[in-house]
Amino acid sequence: MKEIIESIIEGIPHGMIFDTHTIIEYLLQKDSDAYLQNCDGRTTTSYHGYIGQVINDIAEEGLVRRVGDSWSLNIHKRFSECACWQKP
């Protein structure tokens, strides 16, 4: 999953801010097989938390940096709090 998320982030223009919901939505639209294969029986909340942790791990390597939180649509089309990231 880390490699897939890194490739998504690599396609985001430098300086852009995005949130974890954006990465999840991209996975669902462009690589739904990878999204489903890596779910491992987790609940949606748990799995999306895992995806956020993967992005945080990528941030520790310097590919992105955390820039606060957003209030954005989740996969259920409901607004919820979500971590924001910026690609330097």
Please tell me what each predicted stretch does:
Residues I24:
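The alpha-helix within a helix-turn-helix
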Residues M1-G11, H21, Q29-P88:
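Phospho-regulated, low-complexity intrinsically disordered regions of nuclear gene-regulatory
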